[in-house]
Amino acid sequence: TKSKVIVLPCEAYDEERIYTLMKNGLSQLGGLDNLINKEEKILLKPNLLKKAEVEKAVITHPVVVGAFARILREEGYKNIVLADSCGHGTTKQVIQGTGMDTYLEKYQIPAIDYTKGVRVENPDGVQAKEFILPKELLEAECVISLSKMKTHALERITGAVKNSYGFVYGKNKAIGHTKYPSADSFARMLIDLNQHVKPRFYIMDGITAMEGNGPGSGDPVAMNLILMSTDPVALDSVFARLVYLKPEMVPTNYHGEKMGLGNCREENIEVVVVEENPSASAVRDEGSEITGREKQRQNAKVSVDKKQIGIDVVCNVISMEALIEKYGNPNFNVDRTKVRNNVWTKLAKALNIFQKKPYIEPDKCIRCGICVNSCPVPGKAVDFRNGKNNPPVYDYKKCIRCFC
């Protein structure tokens, strides 16, 4: 069966617009009643990598979280908490002052800090046979992932699948980078983790995404989209296509399909665009050509659902080509380098040679110390060993290549 990915075009963090589009998008996934039982304990898991200004696109935008929280409350869901195993700091520390804390207070959703890690067996895992997961996560009956559209130095992109790494408790995240140092082993572990925790569905904030040196130090870039799906691999594959990256070049997509988490191939993904009514006539015949405001598609053929979803909102089943033509960004700064699969690259991979690693450019370094303070490794893998008047130095024997 095809996986359905919902695309919500939205050019600003406007709560009312996001709320309306998201609510109608959820109806395309069968509605919340078919996804979540009213009595279930719900855990919302945004991307809270570290404390940062929301404009820097490091964390899931508070307005996206707030709009979804509003929908949950209006639909009668009562038992809801929000948490993440943050890269730096606690959940409460990271959200303080971002506006997310204000939304959570408004909708009476507590932000909780994980207090205890529990070792759980994962006998069916391909890469990871056990995890250390937070007690509070294990107590939840329904997990909803609210990721951020970003690049990632190791996995090329971080989205729905990678967001689940925030399920791992505390310092065990740093240990995981050491235990699974290659892009492939880390990706397989992430697939195992998603299959173990089984988030009910996934939302990706891509209104302002991050390109370049992600996931923590890249540049904000407007993509003007929110993506939703019950299939994280399909969701990340659409993200990849939107930035002109072949989905199978993303290790979590490649292994995600191979290991049965979801669909990576285009023919197995149905894309539905839920958008504001582009004209006075919201409902068109199926198979008609879109013109006028949507001329950017250059008369691309789309299949249009005859049912109008909500006031001034329409639902279009659209081809991947038409989606990319209208909403894609070929200039998005992401690693599109092809990985050569010959005897030398296999040998280098086996011996951990030519691994990607962080590097400080002495001419550009301002000696701010952020890299030193952010390093999660006990004893620090980067420090001012040559004095604070000189750039910090990495100890690659200690470095876990977290790229945070």
Predicted features along the sequence, with ranges:
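Short Fe-S-cluster ligation motifs
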Residues: Y396-C404
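Ser/Thr/Pro/Gly-rich low-complexity, intrinsically disordered segments
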Residues: S281-G287, T291
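N-terminal and secondary-structure boundary signal
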Residues: T1-S279, K295, N299-P362, I366, ...
